[in-house]
Amino acid sequence: MRDETPAYLRARHYFYEILESQAQTSRMGVIVNRFIVFFIVLSVGITVMESVPAMREDYGRLFQALELLCLVMFSIEYYIRIWIAPEHLPYHHMSPLRAAWAYMISPQGIVDCISVMPLWIALFGPDDLRVLIILRMLRLLKFARYSSGMRSLLEVLESERRALMACLVILACATLVSATAMHIAEGHVQPEKFGTIPDAMWWAIVTLSTIGYGDVVPATGIGRMVASATIICGLIMIALPVGIVANAFSEVIHRRDFIVNWSMVARVPLFSHLTAGDIAHIMQLLQARQIERGEVVFRRGEPATAMYFIAEGDVEIELGPEDKGRRIRLGTGHFFGEIAVLKRVERSATVKAVSRTRLLVLDGADLRALIAREPSIARKINQIVEGRTGRNLNLEIADLEGQADVSVEENA
């Protein structure tokens, strides 16, 4: 059936997939992400090199041209992200204008706006080099979108903010107590360094952080005892937040970028009859993907590029009008998306996550190559699909194997 969605909505969703939902899984999304990261690094590198007078004098025009190119690229990205804002799950219920505004005032939207501000300042504002340098360096914050590690770290800081705030309060108390004790012990001996509690706080902060510049040291026995206690306290102060962040960071990384392991693949019923060697081979083909509750895996009418296995969680399949809009719910161990891949047609259903779901993604070309290697998989797919939908794939096993042979030849 022909997709009646307006062309501009299809285009908007396409760009949303490239920049957001499939930025880490689709080939085009990965290319665009790397392209943007390249311009972030280039822009920051130009800012650093421009601070060297000799390089600014010799390559000033080149730096200006490259900076203008970076600004143009960041501006295009920013305007596209404003346009695709209604595609974001939290903004689905909003009008396009409200969704665009919600994105613009979000933390990521503000960072994207800062990235293009040097262009606006250069065109309409004062030529203040210090302001431009600061704004250019703030582009490093864009890495939070393109680096899963930075996103995970920000998530950890957000989730553990109360514990970290408690550590900060304890550190402030320890600093004040240490500074007061050192002021009492050393204030009369070194009045220029410990004459007041605020003066002594510099020493306390440096000592508690275990940096120890050595510019201020105690001269009395009591002062050394206070310093020893402060050093031991500093080790504890550093260990507390480090342990909290490290443990939470490990949990977030495991939850977000889970590893495709042998037991995970072996639990999938479609692969349960295979040998250990075959499962090890399939492990190399599968990619891990985690989606949140309500997130769309793919929509009806989109090109089919991969099939999916549910490692954990649940999804809901909304079939098309030819199936009277019937909905099917699948859980852990099931698979979906194989029909369109094997028939080389567009998606006939829309799939959404019912809960936080971990998926194993198998590329269409790899699926056909796998069928050529293990024909029993094709037979089992036919059986499972027929039991699920009440109809056969209408593809003979020989046809599937033939498609696999063609795919292998194309990739050779």
Swiss-Prot record:
GO terms for cellular component: voltage-gated potassium channel complex. One of its GO terms (biological process) is action potential. InterPro entries: cNMP-bd_CS (IPR018488), cNMP-bd_dom (IPR000595), cNMP-bd_dom_sf (IPR018490), Ion_trans_dom (IPR005821), RmlC-like_jellyroll (IPR014710), VG_K_chnl (IPR028325). The keyword Secreted does not apply. Signal peptide: none annotated. A nucleoside 3',5'-cyclic phosphate binds at residues 270-388. This is Putative potassium channel protein RPA4233. It comes from Rhodopseudomonas palustris (strain ATCC BAA-98 / CGA009).
